[in-house]
Design a protein with these regions (language model features):
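Structured alpha-helical
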Residues: 1-93
Length: 93
């Protein structure tokens, strides 16, 4: 089956938070690309559809939840691909 992703993913284990309003849900960023990320949380069902992924390594990125399974979620970044790619590249150095 051909790969459907537009961007190459980097496997990482970065701590972060999914922020919505004044609420923040701790998460572990498992992989990341210019287009989005896969994160793990204690309970993916309590996270709203629109969030900000906050990480000390990459800052804040606006995102939409595209899928959920058990304690994992897929995020699609809403920021410009090139901007996100630059942030990720800097964090991976």
């Amino acid at each position: 089956m051909p790969e459907r992703r537009r961007f190459e993913r980097a496997t990482v284990l970065w701590s972060g938070h999914l922020v919505h309003g004044d609420q923040a849900l701790a998460c572990l960023i498992v992989n990341i690309s210019a287009g989005g990320a896969m994160v793990r949380t204690d309970d993916a069902t309590i996270c709203p559809a629109s969030v900000t992924l906050r990480s000390a390594r990459i800052g804040d990125l606006a995102a939409e939840v595209t899928w959920r399974k058990n304690n994992e979620m897929g995020l699609k970044f809403l920021d410009d691909d090139q901007t996100v790619a630059a942030l990720i590249g800097k964090a991976l150095r």
